[in-house]
Amino acid sequence: MRLLGLDVGSKTVGVAQSDPLGWTASSIEIIRINEAQGEFGLDRLGQIISEKKVSGIVIGLPKNMNNTEGPRVEASRNYGKMVSERFGLPIDYQDERLTSVEANRMLIEEADLSRAKRKKVIDSLAAQLILQNYLDKKGRLTNG
């Protein structure tokens, strides 16, 4: 059972995959989107789903530190609805608070990457952290 993890932003979607057993997550790529113009990268996402034989998707929810939901949470849920309707896959959500901060810290401290290089990979690494946190807590897709 391979899952995808998505870190959905207004300009990019970071994509990560689980191993077939659902133990570990690894980043795949960043899909460029343009939320304002209604370009959501679903064609590319569909290619990944098909190539990787994905059975479910986990989408990060960027909740506020006080656990309230802001406009980006709504945008992530809307993206999940679009993905579910288009591909017929179960969707679940994972709290993603601080995953981008953690990804940035990892890239600075452990990989010693420049700011320009970090910007190119941070979203897919955040997606990896979202999916890994989900796998560690739930193990398999629980929603859908």
UniProtKB/Swiss-Prot annotation:
Tagged with keyword Transferase: no
Localization annotation: Cytoplasm
EC number of the protein: 3.1.-.-
GO terms of biological process kind: rRNA 5'-end processing
Name the record gives this protein: Putative pre-16S rRNA nuclease
Organism: Oenococcus oeni (strain ATCC BAA-331 / PSU-1)
A GO CC term attached to the entry: cytosol
Family: Belongs to the YqgF nuclease family.
Enzyme class, broadest EC rank: hydrolase
Function summary: Could be a nuclease involved in processing of the 5'-end of pre-16S rRNA.
Keywords annotated in UniProt: Cytoplasm, Hydrolase, Nuclease, Ribosome biogenesis
